[in-house]
Amino acid sequence: MSTLLEQLIEAFRVLPGVGQKSAQRMAYHVLEREREGGRRLAAALGSAVEKVGHCVQCRDFTESEICTICASSSRDRQQLCVVESPADRLAIEHATGYRGLYFILQGRLSPLDGIGPRELGLDRLSERLAAGEVTEMIIATNATVEGEATAHYLAQLARQHAVRPSRLAQGMPLGGELEYVDRGTLSHAFGTRSEVL
């Protein structure tokens, strides 16, 4: 096998969920049928790696010092939604009418993996809360053990700065049937039920 082909296969393996076989299929596809697409992919990847950084305010990906959301004068600066990843921010932007600002952790607390408050930029978040503009912090971390631990830490941080913490509701999926919902989800939904208005 060609050394360059081996390097291409190994390069594809850096992507999440891509093992040896998938990487091999991708490499063969690019070389057999999509050489022009491969050139565009290489150019876009090279350009993005060089030019895309993090917003100094929210830590989202951007080509500028401050992203378009943080720079927008039409956003509600009293609400700050804290998410684990840029993909989570994008999901909230597309699915809701949320008009506040964001803070992207780029992960979640995981002491076993060496990810603590410093790695998540929580010192920067603390400074932002201390500035006094934010009145509500919406905690939108995932419903995993690490996500819940992160949410607890964030709620404490918000309270230290007299900011009201709120957490996204969790439980029954829209259109879901009780008999098909897993026990943990059903138990959580039942325990956090709310009054019908």
From Swiss-Prot:
InterPro entries: DNA_Rcmb_RecR, Rcmb_RecR, Rcmb_RecR_Znf, TOPRIM_dom, TOPRIM_RecR. One of its GO terms (biological process) is DNA repair. SMART domains: TOPRIM. Disulfide bonds: none annotated. Keywords: DNA damage, DNA recombination, DNA repair, Metal-binding, Zinc, Zinc-finger. Pfam families: RecR_C, RecR_HhH, RecR_ZnF, Toprim_4. The keyword DNA repair applies. GO terms for molecular function: DNA binding; zinc ion binding. It comes from the Bacteria. A zinc finger (C4-type) spans 55-70. Residues 78-173 form the Toprim domain. PANTHER family: RECOMBINATION PROTEIN RECR. Belongs to the RecR family. May play a role in DNA repair. It seems to be involved in an RecBC-independent recombinational process of DNA repair. It may act with RecF and RecO. This is Recombination protein RecR. It comes from Xanthomonas axonopodis pv. citri (strain 306). The gene is recR.
